[in-house]
Amino acid sequence: TEVSQSRDLIRVGSLKGPTSMGLVHMMNDESLSETYDFTMAAAADELLASMVSGELDIALLPANAASVLYNKTEGKIQVIDINTLGVLYLVSGDPSITSWADLAGKTVYLTGKGTTPDYVLQYPLREQAAANGFDAGDVKLEYKSEATEIASLLSENPDAVGLLPQPFATVAMSQNEALRLVFDMTSEWDKVQGEGGSRLVTGVTVVSDSLIETNPEAVAEFLDAHEESAALALSAPDETAAL
């Protein structure tokens, strides 16, 4: 029956933005429509709640949210891959910003206090402030609920400063030619970490222990399909953008 088929579907949740970019070819593959049920959320909290309640089997999450989920489920999830490295950028049309010290006295708009973008900005900001003699507290951080809000704000006011993931950074710059990439946060992270330091892991894929225990073959098949979909996204960016 239709109901029993829906119960057999592997329920996959992801966030709008870079964590979903590697999934888009899977989402649009009709041959997989009877295997996966995809949902996209605007905020990580929605995915956490769905994983805790058992409404999702697999979720693509910010790395820090995955650690929160691990604790909430008392260790009943596993990380099965890293789906996003970096992809965060500081964007502005303010020509006076050429260094971290130039952010003093300005407001930076970003999403989610205590989420991955927050950590990715604050860590190098503190390190650069200590190294270059300015106070990190002089940089005001203002949090918005979604990256689309920041992209819209920047396109209307290019002198503002925002932290955006792809593809939102590119979308904002296409809407206002004054905007530019001020910092690639992956490069800034690497500068602070130094040679041999940790890489900027921003997104991971987690799966419930119950799915691993009851259907390990399905997990392996998902990993293969996800890898193929992500490779297509990288090799055919124009086609991926159209999806």
Regions flagged by a language model, labelled:
Residues 64-65, 149-242:
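Pocket-lining segment of extracytoplasmic ligand-binding domains
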Residues 99-102, 146, 235-238:
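Alpha-helix capping and helix-coil boundary motifs
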